Amino acid sequence: MRDLPPTVFIVDDDEQIRRSCEALVRHAGLRSEQYSSAHAFLEAYDTARPGCLVLDVRMPDMSGLQLQQELNRRGAVIPVIFITGVAEVPEAVEAMQHGAFDFLQKPISAQGLLDRLHRALAFDAATRASLLERRKMQARFDSLTDREREILSLVLEGLSNKEAAARMKLSARTVEIHRASLLRKVGARNTAHLVRMAMELRAPGTEL
């Protein structure tokens, strides 16, 4: 999915708004998909698809805020740009507090929307690249043996090879070998780098 070009998803019950946004997106050379309701979008959307979401705050059946909350529940990282009327600014503020990327007041400014779309798409690409790297890092930690995990836990306690060896009733040389294997497997440059990586991941099997 990450190799797919980004898509601008437009969700609004107002057909005229959808058409206007679609024309603007197409003119900018971007892909788009339009949905007349939050439910229709949820049925079609795969969270692995890159892009951004242009979303009306108030819609019948399921509001934009409710859709945002459902996407958060599903772990979606797609940036959301809310479209609001003057009377809907409080809802837009609430949306921002729940992680919305930005909001745009009606009547929609073409340049304002384009600027937000480009920033949102760049943000989405950076976020997905970061998540991909994190998954790769997690996979490296998951490949550790039970002994390496035990040593990792002691490293995070700040124990030296000699102290870890005494705790584990092993020779310092054996601990040194396992520690070197641990660093190599996870791709850590040194012990300080290893600790930073483990703290970032809160890796399973470590007592953080």
For each feature predicted by the language model, list its residue ranges:
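Non-catalytic signal-transmission and effector/linker regions of two-component phosphorelay proteins
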Residues: 1-9, 15, 22, 37, ...
